[in-house]
Regions:
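Structural signature of tandem alpha-helical TPR/SEL1-like repeats
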Residues: 17-30, 51-64, 85-98, 120-132, ...
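Alpha-helical segment of the N-proximal tetratricopeptide repeat
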Residues: 3-40, 44-53
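Terminal, low-structured helical/coil segments at or just beyond the last alpha-helical repeat
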Residues: 1-5, 11, 159-196
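Structural marker of alpha-solenoid helical repeat scaffolds
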Residues: 34, 68, 102, 136, ...
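Helix-start (N-cap) detector for alpha-helical repeat units in TPR-like alpha-solenoids
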Residues: 4-6, 39-40, 73-74, 107-108, ...
């Protein structure tokens, strides 16, 4: 272990805690310079740069991190998230796919992939992704809502109804929004008693 690099990573964590991202990034960069094999430092820099909207620079550090630790699903997910924030759905799908190859139980990667597939008009694939996200997190209203929208885009009205009925069990407000957005006024009685 490189003790000097470790000290800079520790200082960087302190700066993160104190909400001083510029100083944290500088400390992580120093740590990475002292220990170029530190995927932890590369990941942290990429995450901080992404949170500040410096995507091009963040991408370089994400690629360094996945090169150093190619089997870390969370890093691939974060790379996909960054591409999604840049409105690059095809690149995001590639990164989410890699995250899911490593960890098929990563529900947020299924959800992110579904959103990107929807953005590309790949509704059939999006349905499968949202179904996986919903199976892994049965009470995630956003996964079920977007599943319903993808089913609606494919004109699968019976499936939309099933999704609305499932969503109604735990999130009436999101159910009302899905009923509205899919034009399923025949099911509006389910949420007739909701205020605002």
């Amino acid at each position: 272990m490189n003790l000097e690099a470790w000290r800079h990573r520790l200082r960087a964590r302190l700066y993160e805690f104190l909400r001083r991202p510029d100083k944290a990034i500088a400390e992580y960069r120093t740590a990475l310079g002292l220990d170029p094999a530190s995927a932890q430092a590369a990941r942290a820099i990429a995450f901080l740069l992404t949170s500040r909207g410096h995507y091009a620079e963040a991408e370089r550090y994400f690629h360094a991190a996945v090169h150093l630790e190619p089997q870390r699903a969370a890093t691939w997910f974060n790379l996909g998230f960054m591409h999604d924030k840049q409105h690059q759905p095809a690149k995001a799908i590639e990164a989410f796919h890699e995250a899911l190859r490593i960890n098929p139980g990563l529900d947020r990667a299924w959800y992110g992939m579904g959103l990107c597939q929807t953005a590309l008009g790949q509704h059939e694939a999006a349905v499968k992704s949202f179904e996986q996200a919903g199976q892994l997190q049965p009470m995630n209203p956003h996964a079920w809502y977007h599943l319903g929208l993808a089913q609606h885009a494919l004109h699968k009205q019976d499936k939309v109804k099933e999704t609305i009925m499932h969503l109604h069990r735990f999130d009436p407000k999101m159910t009302r929004q899905l009923i509205h957005d899919t034009g399923r006024s025949d099911l509006s009685h389910l949420v007739a008693d909701l205020r605002n």
